[in-house]
From Swiss-Prot:
A Gene Ontology biological process term: translation
Function: One of the primary rRNA binding proteins, it binds directly near the 3'-end of the 23S rRNA, where it nucleates assembly of the 50S subunit.
Listed Polar residues bias regions: 135-150
UniProt modification remark: Methylated by PrmB.
Protein name from the UniProt record: Large ribosomal subunit protein uL3
GO molecular function, one term: rRNA binding
The keyword Ribonucleoprotein belongs to this UniProt entry's keyword annotation: yes
Gene3D superfamilies the UniProt entry points to: 3.30.160.810, Translation factors
Keyword field: Methylation, Ribonucleoprotein, Ribosomal protein, RNA-binding, rRNA-binding
Lineage, broadest ranks: Bacteria, Pseudomonadati, Pseudomonadota, Alphaproteobacteria, Hyphomicrobiales
Length: 237
């Protein structure tokens, strides 16, 4: 089981495939996604990696989190999340995961917080049909009608579809397709919609119900470290 990644939702657009068909895609961007900490079987009782993404101002980061990031020798992160991994897919602290972690055609599960809609009625929230427009109907055109039973059971069952708060919930969409990736700009293009508003952080994992492609990198696609070579000096004659 590989680690997932954290990406920011940029928005939606469309691209054209080789057959000339337009494909609606959601654009996700990875911003310096690094491993911040490890969870091991010996110390924590399970194996996982903690990832951090984006950049946060030091003044807006708590003292405890500043120390946490300093231990990993990484800059303060805007978003931190943990992903369960198998022992053979553990990633070193400080390593940066790139968008090449996923391959075109791969199925993934995406998790995000849906856009909040506030308090909504049953027609918008549950797609009910509403009441009659006329013929004796007054002020009950968009209501849900009766909600209870009679003396037995004498209550409204839990889970009854009624008006209430809509949206702003954590949702996972399974088996969405990776259309393509752009390593230079750090972009992931996913077919269809992804829960969340523009600018929201999205968790992207390998699909739980579909086999991992054989060409997917393991344990992850890691950006190679840039070596700062010292400038050559002229030897003394």
């Amino acid at each position: 089981m590989r680690s997932g990644v954290i990406a920011k939702k940029v928005g939606m657009t469309r691209i054209y495939n080789d057959a000339g068909e337009h494909v609606p895609v959601t654009v996700l961007q990875m911003e310096n996604c690094q491993v911040v900490a490890q969870r091991t079987q010996e110390k924590n009782g399970y194996t996982a990696v903690q990832l951090g993404v984006g950049l946060a101002k030091v003044k807006n980061t708590s003292k405890a989190m500043r120390g946490h990031f300093a231990t990993a020798s990484v800059e303060p992160k805007a978003k931190v999340a943990e992903f369960r991994v198998s022992a053979d897919n553990m990633i070193d602290v400080g390593a940066e995961i790139t968008v090449e972690h996923f391959v075109a055609g791969q199925k993934v599960d995406v998790t995000g917080t849906t856009i909040g809609k506030g308090f909504q009625g049953v027609i918008k929230r549950h797609h009910m049909g509403g009441g009659r427009a006329t013929h004796g109907n007054s002020v009950s055109h968009r209501t849900h009608g009766s909600t209870g039973q009679r003396q037995d059971p004498g209550k409204v069952f839990k889970g009854k579809k009624m008006a209430g708060h809509m949206g702003d919930t954590r949702v996972t969409t399974q088996n969405v397709e990776i259309v393509s990736t752009d390593a230079d700009r750090g972009l992931i293009l996913i077919r269809g919609a992804v829960p969340g508003s523009k600018g929201a952080w999205i968790l992207v994992r390998d699909a739980a119900k579909v086999a991992l492609p054989a060409n997917a990198p393991k344990p992850a696609a890691i950006r190679a470290a840039v070596k700062n070579e010292a400038p050559a000096t002229e030897g003394a004659e």
